[in-house]
């Protein structure tokens, strides 16, 4: 009887801990933590309540194509994105576009649910040290484990993006106030035709800097018009984290 009770207690504790970690992980991905941090003091995040920000598998990183490993067996990304009316929120660090539909991505045999996308200016990931004006992160979560997958899209100045017009024109007037958009969007409009990518294991690029995030960076950039870029940077012109040491990590390249 005693053994049964101890086993039951252990099972309950395991369930509680797993549920707590899953909840915290999903919350950190759903919305940026808006307390006690800013981009001007990004190097101090680990000393101001976010110790994981000094971890050894942090994001973003610089990509050097010559040092990546081309793996013949890397699978294609399978996007299952559908039309939906998004929910928009200015979370005091960026404009965030929350899911309000059924959108998934399958990668390496796992299917992840789309949670939200948001903007960084300039790009956080660099290519041989070079930045682009904007980087978009599409954040996804494994519904079973809570594991996170982030698809990064570099954005150059060029042709306007119709989807982003709908989003930028619906920017909420009040910060931290989520509004439902009446516009219909499809996330495939944020993706190029060529979906070759770089991938590595990193972290969220904002506090709490949760590690173990799978990053997939689409090689071919998309474009926004100069006016669209300015519309974002007039409000947030420095919401990027500096590149972090790669340490012993490998960046893989699909072809």
PLM regions with names:
Residues 18-19, 46:
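Residue-level signal for mature regions of secreted extracellular proteins and peptides
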């Amino acid at each position: 009887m005693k053994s049964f009770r101890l086993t039951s207690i252990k099972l309950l504790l395991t369930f509680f801990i797993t549920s707590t970690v899953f909840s915290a992980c999903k919350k950190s991905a759903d919305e940026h933590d808006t307390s006690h941090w800013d981009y001007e003091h990004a190097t101090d995040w680990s000393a101001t309540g976010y110790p994981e920000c000094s971890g050894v598998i942090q994001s973003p990183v610089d990509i050097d194509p010559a040092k990546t490993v081309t793996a013949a067996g890397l699978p294609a990304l399978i996007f299952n994105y559908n039309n939906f009316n998004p929910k928009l929120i200015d979370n005091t660090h960026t404009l965030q576009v929350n899911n309000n539909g059924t959108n998934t991505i399958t990668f390496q045999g796992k299917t992840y649910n789309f949670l939200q996308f948001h903007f960084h200016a300039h790009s956080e990931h660099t290519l041989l040290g070079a930045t682009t004006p904007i980087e978009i992160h599409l954040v996804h979560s494994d519904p079973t484990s809570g594991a996170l997958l982030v698809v990064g899209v570099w954005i150059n100045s060029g042709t306007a993006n119709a989807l982003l017009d709908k989003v930028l024109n619906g920017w909420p007037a009040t910060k931290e106030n989520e509004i439902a958009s009446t516009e219909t969007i499809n996330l495939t409009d944020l993706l190029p035709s060529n979906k070759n990518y770089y991938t590595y294991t990193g972290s969220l690029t904002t506090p709490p800097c949760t590690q173990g995030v799978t990053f997939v960076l689409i090689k071919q950039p998309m474009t926004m018009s100069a006016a669209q870029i300015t519309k974002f940077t007039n409000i947030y012109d420095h919401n990027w984290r500096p590149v972090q040491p790669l340490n012993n990590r490998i960046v893989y390249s699909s072809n």
